[in-house]
Amino acid sequence: MSALAAIQPSPDPARSPHLIWVHRTALLVAFFALLLISFGGHVTTIDAGDTEPAWSFRFWDWFVSWAQLEGGHFYEMTHRQLGTIVGFLAILMVGLMWRFEKRAWVRRLGYVALALIIVQGILGGIRVLVVSDPSVQETAMQATGVADPFGVRVLFGMVHATLGLILFALLIGITDMTSGRWFEPRVRVSERAARLVRGLAVLTIAALVLQVILGAWLRHAGWQVAVIIVHAVGALAVALFVLMLAVVAFGLDRKAALVRKPAFVLAALVQVQIFFGIFSFALPELAPVRTLHHIVGALLLAVSAIIAFRAWHVLESVHEDV
């Protein structure tokens, strides 16, 4: 029995028995964040961002007469309500992290996520007020150096959209780090394989962030041929990086399922995304397709982040081939 016990992985001292509550709360935050991104994306798709010109920190006003809302106003106000829910859930998540999460670096990521959620809420409010409030518009133009109101509106819309998807990827990463999977034994792989997976994961994330920025440009500033071409070329680059990452990941030991499985999901998602991208260009009047293109973009970035986090945590590189 002593020999058997010796080869069993010992309990990780960083794993609190109460960590399951942090994980469950993080899952709730990520779920509502995806809903938030979905409604926000559709608001942009149907150009409904200015249907409610008023914005303040009186968030409870957004829940009044919600059932009577229609059309774009319904999507805009639901987007704000979901943002409020995400904010309060994130506060709960960070509180549970402070109490039960023993790893300081994970707690810090939680604090960063909460800070970004607050920033996102303020950015969303500024995006509304630069159109409806002349004083905010003038201040924003002076602060950014953008000379026209439309340009300021586009700038804040792009930053709000891009940061939202990056924040979602971070939240998904936190759900993974607080799950039981994170504490499974590491997998030994060759140093070359580990470097390839990590490098390709970072390249994929970088390419996806650029794609998100370009997509936000097209969605907020209107379709421009040059930007569409660059966005299409970027899609090919992302597809190439994902293909290379999938090939390398599938070549890993089967024990590295925590890296192999999300690589398979990523390869499937990129095909779906290309399909939605083509249809968004060919049939721009189909608003749901354009919104789905936005949502799948968020999922691509999130899955890529999971692969990157796991590539550093799960894979243990060794000099000799294993």
Please name every model-derived segment:
Residues 22-26, 104-114, 196-204, 256-267, ...:
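Membrane-interfacial loop-to-transmembrane alpha-helix junctions, especially the N-terminal start
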Residues 85-92, 162-179, 234-247, 298-311:
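Hydrophobic cores of alpha-helical transmembrane segments in multi-pass inner/ER membrane proteins
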Residues 44-77, 139-149:
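Extracytosolic (periplasmic/ER-lumenal) interhelical loops and adjacent juxtamembrane/interface segments
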Residues 31-35, 115-117, 167-170, 196-216:
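Alpha-helical transmembrane segments of multi-pass integral membrane proteins
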Residues 1-19, 179-197, 317-322:
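Membrane-interfacial, low-structure loops and terminal tails that flank and connect transmembrane helices
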Residues 148-160, 224-231, 286-296:
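Non-cytosolic membrane-interface motifs at loop->transmembrane helix junctions
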Residues 76, 80, 223-240:
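A loop-to-helix transmembrane entry motif
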Residues 21-49, 211:
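N-terminal signal-anchor transmembrane alpha helix
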